[in-house]
Amino acid sequence: MEPSVDANSITITVEGMTCISCVRTIEQQIGKVNGVHHIKVSLEEKSATIIYDPKLQTPKTLQEAIDDMGFDALLHNANPLPVLTNTVFLTVTAPLTLPWDHIQSTLLKTKGVTGVKISPQQRSAVVTIIPSVVSASQIVELVPDLSLDMGTQEKKSGACEEHSTPQAGEVMLKMKVEGMTCHSCTSTIEGKVGKLQGVQRIKVSLDNQEATIVFQPHLITAEEIKKQIEAVGFPAFIKKQPKYLKLGAIDVERLKNTPVKSSEGSQQKSPSYPSDSTTMFTIEGMHCKSCVSNIESALSTLQYVSSIVVSLENRSAIVKYNASLVTPEMLRKAIEAISPGQYRVSIASEVESTASSPSSSSLQKMPLNIVSQPLTQEAVININGMTCNSCVQSIEGVISKKPGVKSIHVSLANSTGTIEFDPLLTSPETLREAIEDMGFDAALPDMKEPLVVIAQPSLETPLLPSSNELENVMTSVQNKCYIQVSGMTCASCVANIERNLRREEGIYSVLVALMAGKAEVRYNPAVIQPRVIAEFIRELGFGAMVMENAGEGNGILELVVRGMTCASCVHKIESTLTKHKGIFYCSVALATNKAHIKYDPEIIGPRDIIHTIGSLGFEASLVKKDRSANHLDHKREIKQWRGSFLVSLFFCIPVMGLMVYMMVMDHHLATLHHNQNMSNEEMINMHSAMFLERQILPGLSIMNLLSLLLCLPVQFCGGWYFYIQAYKALKHKTANMDVLIVLATTIAFAYSLVILLVAMFERAKVNPITFFDTPPMLFVFIALGRWLEHIAKGKTSEALAKLISLQATEATIVTLNSENLLLSEEQVDVELVQRGDIIKVVPGGKFPVDGRVIEGHSMVDESLITGEAMPVAKKPGSTVIAGSINQNGSLLIRATHVGADTTLSQIVKLVEEAQTSKAPIQQFADKLSGYFVPFIVLVSIVTLLVWIIIGFQNFEIVETYFPGYNRSISRTETIIRFAFQASITVLCIACPCSLGLATPTAVMVGTGVGAQNGILIKGGEPLEMAHKVKVVVFDKTGTITHGTPVVNQVKVLVESNKISRNKILAIVGTAESNSEHPLGAAVTKYCKKELDTETLGTCTDFQVVPGCGISCKVTNIEGLLHKSNLKIEENNIKNASLVQIDAINEQSSTSSSMIIDAHLSNAVNTQQYKVLIGNREWMIRNGLVISNDVDESMIEHERRGRTAVLVTIDDELCGLIAIADTVKPEAELAVHILKSMGLEVVLMTGDNSKTARSIASQVGITKVFAEVLPSHKVAKVKQLQEEGKRVAMVGDGINDSPALAMANVGIAIGTGTDVAIEAADVVLIRNDLLDVVASIDLSRKTVKRIRINFVFALIYNLVGIPIAAGVFLPIGLVLQPWMGSAAMAASSVSVVLSSLFLKLYRKPTYDNYELHPRSHTGQRSPSEISVHVGIDDTSRNSPRLGLLDRIVNYSRASINSLLSDKRSLNSVVTSEPDKHSLLVGDFREDDDTTL
């Protein structure tokens, strides 16, 4: 039956649907339209897929029909897809009861029938149907008088059905599926998706972690399939866009029916093939393991192919087949026809089997005889976890029995296994899995060397075509590339990228650095290119960009080489090093004894280079770099300004003495003038008679000469730094504070010098009045201010300096043997540590690099990095952070991140960037400062001119208020001096520094204090924005809750003399130990803790049924119970909450403990228990009856938001376990504090509304958005922002990244050092919700301090400048220039000191708030909570349900929360942390949660 196309399919986007009723309305109305065969509407996808007759309808008419119903229909793609139709042959098997016309009319009215041809003479009908809409059996049911013509059907379609060939219009989809751990997972996915309508075939590969699905796009979409896989509990990603299949029925018919023909143009017959032959094909166009799987699965379905092995590395396939049925040419065409039709196939070799004896001439034509000369391969597998020779013997004994394994040798010292095997019977991956199944970690090597092909020698023919050809084909080259990765938020993202990239063909190793946002990938350039790798990362949902030059010379080494005497030594070192593999460049300078080397750290390390130079007879050592934080504590600047101040002070003291002397003498003369009525001439003579006023030369007095001599060194030595900075500013066409200072002092000095020279030139008898006293006093106060300012600035960076000081300077590298015994220790510089080194850290020592503990137990102080006050326990497998301090035990760690890639280095970089970033308010201050200096200069000039005018118009004002005025000076000179004094004072008192320091100093202290408390604030903008926040939105899972389920209660449902509680825990823990579900892991963890053991019994026949539960058989638990001592048993009984259904007293329970005596017999030790664990439905399926008491207990747990599961042992209901994701202890307090701060608190989650309501009631949140998809969280945050509210989003950074980025302030909570760098504005290193309160509180305190600083700065300038300009002269308020400089210095110092008050900040802690009464905290009743479901704002207030409705809803919620595949398609939530729907209960209603 060859398919034809008589129908089309179109997908139309439909907007405006709100509920299932809309879906049904559209389906009913459009389904009635003439020419529409089938319609499927998806509310979630907002689309309608319609199959229609193109002769009667068009996409445009269908779009208009939906528009007419009141919905918005959009046609994005007007090109319809053809829909497959089949032909059904019907014959009359009995006398007709209906006329042929009636039969034809009935069939044509049937949906899915596109044509009917009636043949009354042949008493038959040919009906064209759409098989996806209607089936042949349904057609027969419509017309009972007709029956299927089976002979015709078999004749037409037998071949197609037999081989399940793809049909026209079918689409093949490849999806990456994560989280699969065993074949049970693959069976679950195949069973779930295979039942979906429109899915034709599905094949799930555990090795490749992918699923290949063939489906009909008009019935189901790729997105729906993806969500169904995620509903089972496995994250899925569409790997490639779906493609239509090309291999049709005709291809398989050609394979089966094509006769054996000689090649075109061949003059002789092709050789006769024996019954069993093998041929090797060369295949071009394969890219990954998916291609290998595709070819193997396609050919293995053919009857005449007995086996096929495809090698991606060798680009070849070895096919074993029945030569009497098929030829190599037919197989070649079959491979080329396999979808996607990209393979180019050629026959590499044709051979005969040993079943016949080929002639010598035949053999000469065959280059490779694989059957008569058995082909084998050798694989080397890395095996970790072996501890002794018993492990070696165990592996060799088991693997040697596997089919196809010829020999195996396992090396304990090298942790490898070398296996020789037959590739036709097994593969390296199968052998690796077999070793892993034994409990060892097995991995295939990074493909540095190809598999070794081994064969038996042959006398007739050579085994391989040629060694050169084989070497060319199988040589593998490794390159390295760096890719910048954005969007990573935590360690889960890192693991996701590394795990998925390693699966891609041609990629050898991947190392991703979270903090640096960089991935280092080693790959085979013949197989894959960096841009393709970047595309793979983008397909995983991250941003990726190839770093072009990152890999070039990424290792740079500076060495001091001693012992060189001439140029010959230089040449010897350079030539020797450049010959080494991995060294790109080497330059040695004899004059400086330094060597500059660029190298590849993957190939050679710095210690290797130093050793090589040492072997040449020279001594090489690392150039010491300054790792101190001197640049942060401003020591250099402090020393500089202290020197400037002391120089200025040394010369200023005599100047001030002279000034004071002259002021006293002038006051004395003024008193004499007033008391004795002296004339002006007498006053002048008396003034000139003073010692300091005596003239050495005409016009040059002693006073002016001393002032000049004292002013010169201050002006040009003490003020040198000011001149340098002012020159640089003017050079770049800007003006700053230094320009004002230089202007003021230079004008005063220049004016004084010029007027003095003029007086000397004119031989004046009256000494001119100079300003030589002004520069020394100005520089003294300004230098003092700068000195104090830099001391204060050093304090602002104290936090960052502390972080930098944490970095270790040396590391102890150890060498271990194969038994992990210490061979040697070596103390090296921390810069010489290489990735993969084993480092020993003694008690009290600092961890030099990030790493993973491989041996030892200790407590580690991470307080200065994470803010966590309590030491953290470390054991093998734990990660450690560079800079943290080891406390009480020696540890061996393996370096994972070194140098600038360590977490500490990245945090230091982050804090440095934050302290140098500008807040919006600072940008305003900077803009203001840009206009400030020109404005002050203008004011100074205006002040000068105005006072000159006023002085000449009304001299009495100047005479009255000018300090030190005496009549010996002329009026003009007095006016000019007074005007200059006011002008210079304006220049001195104006201070843009205070404006410029107001924000950055506060930001530096604020971010530093935050870093010390485990709060990383990324710059001034989020620090300023956080205080404006009005709404705080919390994610649920991992933020409000812990994100991991725990056991809340265990109820024993049988008498304790039948089975004890400990025995139930031992059996349940053993059964759940094989489960990968988080609920199972929680139960296992609880059982191990209660039994105080790390090992459990044996579990066999383990089966998991998604949506229900598990079943298995458990043995070997009596020995486990025997090891439990009496003290642990008594503590368990005391602490556990045991609820007995059939009452039995406590004494009886204790006395009948099931602890087994030491003389247990072997028969008892091997007792087997049949175990069932699951929900109600699972128990009912297995024929168990649930009593009302048990049912009520489950309902009560479900009401509190817990998941309740039942336990059956040997067909008897024994226990009930309640499991929940617990709320963090500080969550309720944090919400209460935020509300008391005037903030609105909202809970947003992808979980169901019932769970969300339960969580909200416990922590006191009254507004909830439930069942919100991750993509909709962004829309919800935006919606709150459109209401005029500033939003802070708090999430764990896994699926909340888009919402964190959209919020005004994104706050990411990290666990330990897993910090969300990219998405969030604020990163909380500790997993503590009170840090959310602290971050907002710190922001408020910092912004308040910034405002206080601005008040200080503005007061000085707005009040000081008018005073200096003489505006308040009429009321007697006037300033000298030195007073202005003192005020200016005080303004800068006061601003910095004000910022330093932030160092007194103490973040709120749990204990602090617990001391205060919390009468307003506590739970909210359900009626107080407003729950909004989905993206719309439909609020669900507390429902009022009857008893029966409550039971039904709670039961359904329990089943749905336990296993998500019972949900409808529209309720599937793609949020990974919420996918288990772990409900959190109220732990305060009673005490039954005590275990």
From Swiss-Prot:
How is this protein situated with respect to the membrane? Multi-pass membrane protein
The tissues where this chain's protein is expressed are given as: Widely expressed. Highly expressed in pituitary endocrine cells. Expressed in melanocytes (at protein level). Expressed in motor neuron (at protein level). Expressed in hippocampal neuron (at protein level). In the kidney, it is detected in the proximal and distal tubules (at protein level). Expressed in aorta (at protein level).
One GO biological process term = negative regulation of catecholamine metabolic process
Sorted keywords for this record are: ATP-binding, Cell membrane, Cell projection, Copper, Copper transport, Disease variant, Endosome, Glycoprotein, Golgi apparatus, Ion transport, Magnesium, Membrane, Metal-binding, Nucleotide-binding, Phosphoprotein, Repeat, Synapse, Translocase, Transmembrane, Transmembrane helix, Transport
Q: Which residues bind ATP?
A: E1072
- What is said about its interaction partners and assembly? Monomer. Interacts with PDZD11. Interacts with ATOX1 and COMMD1. Interacts with TYRP1. Directly interacts with SOD3; this interaction is copper-dependent and is required for SOD3 activity.
Q: What is this protein called?
A: Copper-transporting ATPase 1
Organism expressing this protein natively: Mus musculus
**Taxonomic lineage of this organism?**
Eukaryota, Metazoa, Chordata, Craniata, Vertebrata
